[in-house]
């Protein structure tokens, strides 16, 4: 994670580019492989990460443009979480890492958004790319999944692009770190590409490097020898 002030500065910059209403950033949920507790490697939504920074499932972020406040919705660690993973930080502790003071349980999100809709407030969101997120937004906002792209906020999309296309020094530093990792992955693959070596061996080594030095690859490795 970056410094907490960076995330609050990003949210402040987004407010300055937007009009009024509420910006809704749904985080990603775990995706099961073959039963609920056996999940694929978790990947947080990039926009949620950019503005709220927490790489954890089952969270949602709100930026209230009219009140100038930020809210993080998420549940406290369960007893199962503590048994399997040991002591876990509270929602307040997690939120403090990204300069958010207002935290609420995920069960309160539906009422919060419903009250905003009934008050005539605009809810800004970007088009979802995952089916589970589309279903969640559909239920929360009362919009059929097929119409979510129609109701998605073009104003928000343009504002996010305007912010994210300009990289600050700390972002460039992180990008350069990942360039070094990518270089190691590619040069390792080149050295291994010899007669008798099969693709899965090279693939496995490349994936291992990605997880050793970072958080895995941003897209599946494309490899042919």
Where are the regions a protein language model picked out?
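Active-site cores enriched in adjacent His and Asp/Glu residues with nearby glycine-rich loops
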Residues: 19-36, 176-225
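A composition/biophysics-driven feature that prefers long, compositionally simple stretches
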Residues: 1-184
């Amino acid at each position: 994670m970056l410094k907490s002030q960076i995330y609050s500065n990003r949210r402040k910059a987004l407010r300055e580019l937007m009009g009024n209403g509420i910006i809704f950033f749904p985080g990603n949920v775990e995706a099961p492989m073959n039963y609920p507790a056996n999940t694929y490697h978790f990947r947080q939504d990039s926009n949620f990460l950019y503005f709220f920074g927490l790489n954890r499932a089952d969270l949602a972020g709100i930026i209230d443009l009219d009140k100038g406040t930020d809210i993080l919705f998420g549940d406290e660690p369960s007893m199962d979480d503590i048994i399997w993973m040991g002591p876990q930080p509270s929602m307040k502790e997690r939120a403090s890492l990204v300069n958010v003071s207002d935290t609420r349980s995920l069960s309160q999100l539906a009422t919060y958004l419903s009250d905003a809709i009934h008050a005539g407030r605009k809810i800004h969101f970007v088009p979802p790319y995952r089916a589970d997120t589309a279903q969640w937004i559909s239920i929360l906002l009362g919009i059929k999944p097929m119409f979510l792209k129609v109701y998605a906020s073009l104003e928000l999309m343009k504002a996010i692009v305007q912010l994210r296309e300009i990289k600050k020094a700390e972002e460039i530093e992180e990008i350069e770190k990942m360039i070094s990792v990518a270089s190691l992955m590619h040069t390792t693959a080149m050295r291994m590409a010899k007669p008798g070596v099969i693709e899965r061996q090279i693939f496995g080594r490349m994936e291992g490097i990605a997880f050793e030095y970072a958080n895995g690859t941003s897209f599946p490795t494309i490899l042919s020898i």
